[in-house]
C-alpha cells in the first residue's frame, strides 16, 4: 500500500511536532506533540494550524487544537504501530527528505529497539509539491500530496 507522509518539525533537523500519513484509499493517521519552544517561523506558520484539519466527511467543520489532543512520542509510536498493522507492506512517499528522517526517528524506541512494522520502502519526490487546504498542517499537506500524485497518474503524467 502506498502511503503519503508529511511532518512538521521545529526548524531544520528540529524536534517533531506532527506526523501524518494518508493511504491510497484515504485512511489517515495524524498525531501531534507540544512544541514548548518554537522557532519564530513555526510559531507563526505551524502552531496556528496544528490540529486543524478536515474531518471526514469532507465539508465538516475543522477540528481545533486542544491540549488534551497532544500525544507523547511513546503514544505516537504505539498508535503508529497499530495503524501500520493493517498493511502487508507499506511504500512511504514524501516530498521532502526530512519527512522520511522524522518518520524513521519515530520508529526507534530505544537503543537497538523499534516498533514492529510491515516491510517498509520509501521514496522522495520533488514533483508532488501541492498547496493544501491548510498549509503547514501535516495531515492536509499529506492529503494534498496524495491527490496530486493520483491525479498525475490518472492523467498519464507519471
Q: What are the residue ranges of the model-derived segments?
A:
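Short, surface-exposed basic-aromatic patches at helix termini and helix-loop junctions that form
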Residues: 22-23, 107-112, 154
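Short, glycine/acidic-enriched loop or turn micro-motifs at the edges of active sites
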Residues: 9-11, 98, 144
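Conserved non-catalytic scaffold segment of RNase H-like nuclease domains
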Residues: 3, 8-94
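Short, flexible loop segments at boundaries between secondary-structure elements
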Residues: 114-134
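Substrate-recognition/cap helix-loop segment adjacent to the acidic, metal-dependent catalytic center
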Residues: 98-117
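Acidic, Mg2+-coordinating catalytic module of metal-dependent nucleases/exonucleases
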Residues: 96, 129-158
Amino acid at each position: 500500500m502506498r502511503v503519503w507522509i508529511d511532518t512538521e518539525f521545529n526548524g531544520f533537523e528540529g524536534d517533531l511536532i506532527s506526523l501524518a500519513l494518508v493511504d491510497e484509499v484515504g485512511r489517515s493517521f495524524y498525531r501531534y506533540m507540544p512544541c514548548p519552544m518554537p522557532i519564530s517561523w513555526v510559531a507563526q506558520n505551524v502552531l496556528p494550524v496544528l490540529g486543524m484539519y478536515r474531518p471526514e466527511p469532507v465539508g465538516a467543520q475543522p477540528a481545533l487544537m486542544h491540549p488534551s489532543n497532544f500525544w507523547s512520542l511513546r503514544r505516537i509510536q504505539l498508535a503508529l504501530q497499530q495503524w501500520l498493522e493493517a498493511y502487508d507492506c507499506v511504500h512511504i512517499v514524501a516530498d521532502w527528505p526530512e519527512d522520511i528522517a522524522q518518520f524513521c526517528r519515530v520508529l526507534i524506541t530505544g537503543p537497538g529497539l523499534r516498533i514492529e512494522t510491515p516491510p517498509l520502502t520509501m521514496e522522495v519526490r520533488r514533483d508532488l509539491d501541492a498547496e493544501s487546504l491548510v498549509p503547514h498542517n501535516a495531515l492536509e499537506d499529506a492529503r494534498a500530496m496524495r491527490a496530486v500524485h493520483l491525479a498525475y497518474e490518472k492523467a498519464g503524467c507519471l
